[in-house]
Amino acid sequence: MQSYDVIIVGGGHAGCEAASASARTGARTALVTYRLSDMGTMSCNPAIGGLGKGHLVREIDALDGLMGRAADFAGIQFRLLNRRKGPAVRGPRTQADRQLYKKAIQKLLREQDNLFIIEDEVVDIIVKNNRVSGVFLKNQGNIFSGAVVLTTGTFLNGLIHIGDKTWPAGRMGEQASVQLAERLKNYGISFGRLKTGTPARLSKKTIRWDVLPKQQADEDPVPFSFLTEKIKQPQIECAITRTNAQTHHIISENIHRSALYSGAIEGVGPRYCPSIEDKIIKFGERDGHQIFLEPEGLEDDVIYPNGISTSLPEDVQISLLKTIEGLENVNVLQPGYAIEYDFINPQYLSKTLELRSLPGLFLAGQINGTTGYEEAAAQGLLAGLNAARQVGGLDEIILSRSTAYIGVMIDDLISRGVCEPYRMFTSRAEFRLSLRADNADARLTPLAQEWGIVSHKRWTCYQNKQQRLDHARSICQKLFLTPNEASAHGLQINNDGVRRSAYSLLSYPNMNVARLTDFWPQLHSIDAKTVESLEIEAQYAVYLERQKQDIAALQRDESLEIPSSLNIQAIYGLSNELKTKIQKISPRSIADAQKIDGMTPAALSLIITYIQRQRREKGKLA
């Protein structure tokens, strides 16, 4: 009889991170996947990171996960998005060579102690005494465990649509998980349907690259992993093209043949990654939509046309593509398609990602209503970690909204649910000044060390980095200038007689360590990476102190009761939409009000201030 502590179902991004995290705790872990060769496959776009998503990858890496290291190994076009904006909203991103990425993930999994990889299909879960105790495999029968993590992606009752053609599949060329979906319903688990889509794949050789503008990689690529010292793969360029009036005419004339508009698809698609049909219908006034032509690998003939996903019939896809500049003679290697799949309302989960109605069953990834590799991987890590800790009799791990973007995402999912695929953005985090991509290790690696999931190499690397930063900070805090001394060097500060440290001067606009070396040459000894960390820390110091107070105040206010007599209509500045929702839901506390869909920190502040003012006025009357 095969027995493990934790079984992971699925070898996608969520499953790989779940398996690694579980095994790193010391738990005997099994990862069950259809095909060993498909572990870590990038099913859709050949890219990792982006706005909000890049923060998740950095956090996964800070917790010693896999995605950041694999992306650095496979990255072929690194770009730091929002580079000109503040550090809090900068988003690391890279295009990745599909084959190299998969190779990196599989290597990391093969090298992981306590991890056993099984090639088979899970067709049922085993439940004893209302608790999951294993899975049933199609070929090998029962295997048992203390907990199971389901990471089925788009495979659970997956259905591909191309025009009027529909067939069961998890992704193109792979079977759907139909039997498992039916068996799960027998345990009282109810499902919804979501949809996502992918564009056609094009032959690189048949594109007129010479007529198209290019997008270059950054000259100084910023890696994802705190362990990566240098990006080693050659950096490539992409090309940019656009749809046009002729493209739009073809789509409009054939919109009835799109699976999305014919009524064949019932699932809701991702708002922030619409199909080209949606773009034409919803933004008909635009004369064109941008398309990025992204190579899928260094030695690959396949091009991913980012921005033109579709479920139109194949003949229509070919026609519309040939109207686009540079693609007049393009050869389509694989048509675009939409895929529908089952998901579970994440409000049925606890914050450990365990299904409340079926103890021992944890869920991660698209089965929870999210979209994207990064969102899936982050959930997988937390689900695998909590599954292993539960089996080991250890306390559960819950990341708060003020600690990590992972905490923001999980709290959003559990408290608000989803009506469309959930995507991470920096705007979702109310404490984003402290949840930066650059300080993910400072926030999370010490926690991961406490949980026992960090390698000796990473912990040593982290300690060395912090020691360098502490030393540099100490130097800067001991160096002082008077306003007169600053003025003599061309630096204008308030002439108030107050001596200022080099550290405090770094918070001034357009100030940096390089400029301060004119006053203090000893600052030349600080290495470039430490300088960057020091400058960001100093720039945000005042704001972060204020944010700490806001976090502490919010934590105090969460327990504040909302009186049933509260006249919500009297709160000035609150939107009518929120007033209606509050009246309907009648939250009993600020913590309950936080969970209302659309609730913002600003709105909560208005409610808290109003309640506190009402209490003070009542106190005066008494």
Curated annotation (Swiss-Prot):
Q: Is Membrane among the key words of this record?
A: no
> Tell me, what is one Gene Ontology molecular-function annotation carried by this entry?
flavin adenine dinucleotide binding
Which amino acid positions bind NAD(+), per UniProt? 269-283
According to its UniProt record, which cofactors does this protein need?
FAD
Recorded hits in SMART domains, A to Z, give: GIDA_assoc_3 (SM01228)
Keyword entries, A-Z: Cytoplasm, FAD, Flavoprotein, NAD, tRNA processing
> Which residues are involved in binding FAD?
10-15, 122, 177, 366
User: Which cellular component, as a GO term, is one annotated location?
Assistant: cytosol
Report the protein's function.
NAD-binding protein involved in the addition of a carboxymethylaminomethyl (cmnm) group at the wobble position (U34) of certain tRNAs, forming tRNA-cmnm(5)s(2)U34.
Protein name, UniProt field: tRNA uridine 5-carboxymethylaminomethyl modification enzyme MnmG
Q: Which gene encodes it?
A: mnmG
